[in-house]
């Protein structure tokens, strides 16, 4: 599976993953809205929005 792994508004980059899902985490801090993308579907702390999906590059 191919997942996007760029941070926030960086140019799109991808990585090949062993997992069958991709994630996109979104949260806000003193720098504004932050976005993290990667492989799998991790547990997140309260206040962090998590979207998990199961197709190539679905987390852009």
Swiss-Prot record:
Family: Belongs to the three-finger toxin family. Short-chain subfamily. Type I alpha-neurotoxin sub-subfamily.
Location of the protein in the cell: Secreted
Presence of the UniProt keyword Transcription regulation in the record: no
Keywords for the protein's UniProt record, in alphabetical order: Acetylcholine receptor inhibiting toxin, Disulfide bond, Ion channel impairing toxin, Neurotoxin, Postsynaptic neurotoxin, Secreted, Toxin
SUPFAM superfamilies, per the entry: Snake toxin-like (SSF57302)
CDD domains (UniProt xref): TFP_snake_toxin
Protein origin, superkingdom: Eukaryota
Disulfide bond entries: 3-22, 17-39, 41-52, 53-58
InterPro entries linked to this entry: Snake_3FTx, Snake_toxin-like_sf, Snake_toxin_con_site, Toxin_cobra-type
GO molecular function: acetylcholine receptor inhibitor activity; ion channel regulator activity; toxin activity
Native source organism of the sequence: Hydrophis cyanocinctus (Asian annulated sea snake)
PROSITE patterns: SNAKE_TOXIN
Keyword Hydrolase applies: no
One GO CC annotation: extracellular region
Known function: Binds to muscle nicotinic acetylcholine receptor (nAChR) and inhibit acetylcholine from binding to the receptor, thereby impairing neuromuscular transmission.
Tissue distribution of the protein: Expressed by the venom gland.
The protein, known as: Short neurotoxin 1
Main subcellular location of this protein, as a coarse class: secreted
